[in-house]
């Protein structure tokens, strides 16, 4: 059913679609002299005041009910870029609110009133986790109305929801070995979101499965000799992986995830930057603060494999404002920890959704932060690539991935001569105590064809 919304023509510019720059939202016509008496700051104050009142009256939650939903929500962010003056005493706001399970609802608010006294007159659910319920259309009579979107899907943007099943192969090509060599290889493990079965493992030399206790990683430790030169190491996993949403983890040592490590500094300029971001966004909870930091990185860091990228050095990310997934998430973790929000790192591989077999383009990493009694999964570099999914990736990881290890500055026993392992996605190789390189490739087949 179409819902007609009469708007004042001389002052309205509606940008179609969801709260995003390419489709847009409602904006004001700044030529209308009568409207200039009200500022966007007034509209922001008005919507925040309405939401705060609803939260206070709702026992700490923004409660929303319609014919099919009964939601208790927490504020994530006000989209200040889409606050609009529709006409004299008529305004628009777009706000993200989240359930305790991490589902993020994009809600459209219409308000009436004057500065200091604005009241919400209409509230619509526009999106769920980045997928729209409706889009905006302009009719021949120059009024705007909403058109329902049926079966909106994230599939085309690389996301598989629910559960994914695939076989994953991790292959290492050993180089020429001139003397004794040692290698540390991550071993994927089962947890509450992924079930891992090793279906084959072929490796030369002496093998030992060792534990890295700080973050609970399992590592295959190999001792190799010259006769193992140019041989292959192959591990194949059968994987069943569930989509991840915010979850409780009672075993977490939160203080550990507030500490600095060599590539994840805490304090100093990171505290200054975090404070400025949080203050500008008027964020007053762990959830809204984390979203403000997430948005800052999306808006200011460029995904580019150039310079000294791939080390996960938050200082480099802060200076260069570019990098791959390691820079994006390291920068976030340093800012988050500096703001008093526990945050942690994991690495693995993202499995293509658009095909069912073939190569995987290297490792991928992601992060989690702690708020509202749960760990919230995020993927900022993917949110940066695909604007429509920036909401989804704040609170979710899709099913089509495998985690290989977690944590930074790993100290297994035995430890490499070079010291703690920064993070473990590709193997660490030492030949006669010096760093070596072994080409590593990933591949997959979806659907467990061997079962």
For each predicted feature, which ranges?
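Intrinsically disordered, low-complexity N-terminal segments that are enriched in acidic
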Residues: 149-242
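C-terminal motif of bacterial Sec signal peptides marking the signal peptidase cleavage site
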Residues: 16-18
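Low-complexity, Gly/Ser/Thr/Pro-rich intrinsically disordered linker/tail segments
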Residues: 393-451
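Hydrophobic/aromatic-rich core segments of domains that either
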Residues: 330-418
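N-terminal secretory signal peptides
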Residues: 29-87
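C-terminal partner/receptor-binding element of secreted or periplasmic proteins
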Residues: 37-45, 118-154, 293
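Bacterial signal peptide processing site
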Residues: 20-22
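Acidic low-complexity segments
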Residues: 212-214, 232-319
């Amino acid at each position: 059913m179409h819902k007609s919304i009469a708007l004042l023509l001389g002052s309205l510019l509606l940008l179609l679609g969801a709260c995003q720059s390419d489709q847009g939202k409602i904006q004001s016509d700044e030529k209308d002299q009568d409207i200039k008496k009200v500022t966007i700051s007034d509209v922001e104050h008005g919507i925040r005041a309405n939401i705060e009142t609803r939260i206070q009256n709702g026992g700490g939650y923004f409660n929303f009910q319609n014919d099919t939903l009964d939601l208790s929500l927490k504020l994530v962010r006000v989209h200040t870029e889409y606050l609009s003056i529709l006409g004299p005493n008529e305004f628009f706001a777009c706000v993200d609110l989240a359930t305790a399970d991490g589902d993020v609802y994009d809600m459209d608010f219409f308000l009436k009133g004057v500065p200091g006294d604005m009241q919400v007159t209409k509230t619509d659910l526009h999106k769920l986790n980045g997928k729209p319920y409706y889009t905006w259309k302009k009719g021949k009579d120059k009024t705007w109305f909403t058109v329902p979107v049926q079966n909106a899907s994230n599939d085309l943007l690389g996301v598989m929801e629910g559960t994914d099943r695939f076989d994953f192969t991790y292959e290492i090509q050993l180089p020429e070995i001139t003397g004794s060599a040692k290698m540390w290889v991550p071993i994927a493990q089962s947890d509450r979101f992924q079930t891992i079965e090793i279906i084959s493992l072929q490796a030369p030399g002496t093998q030992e499965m060792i534990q890295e206790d700080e973050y609970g990683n399992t590592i295959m430790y190999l001792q190799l000799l010259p006769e193992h030169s140019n041989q292959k190491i192959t591990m194949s996993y059968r994987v069943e992986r569930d989509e991840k949403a915010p979850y409780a983890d009672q075993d977490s040592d939160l203080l550990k995830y507030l500490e600095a490590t060599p590539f994840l500094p805490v304090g100093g300029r990171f505290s200054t930057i975090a404070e400025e971001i949080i203050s500008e966004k008027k964020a007053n909870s762990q959830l809204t603060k984390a979203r403000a930091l997430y948005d800052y990185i999306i808006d200011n860091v460029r995904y580019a494999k150039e310079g000294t990228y791939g080390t996960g050095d938050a200082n480099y990310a802060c200076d260069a404002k570019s990098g791959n997934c390691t820079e994006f998430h390291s920068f976030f973790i340093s800012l988050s920890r500096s703001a008093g929000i526990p945050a942690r790192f994991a690495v693995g591989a993202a499995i293509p959704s658009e095909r069912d077999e073939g190569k995987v383009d290297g490792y991928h990493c992601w992060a989690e932060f702690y708020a509202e009694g749960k760990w919230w999964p995020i993927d900022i570099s993917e949110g940066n690539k695909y604007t429509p999914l920036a909401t989804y990736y704040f609170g979710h990881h899709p099913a089509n991935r495998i985690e290989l290890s977690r944590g930074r500055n790993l100290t297994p026993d035995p430890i490499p001569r070079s010291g703690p392992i920064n993070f473990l996605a590709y193997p660490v190789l030492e030949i006669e105590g010096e760093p070596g390189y072994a080409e590593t490739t990933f591949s997959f087949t979806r659907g467990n064809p061997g079962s």
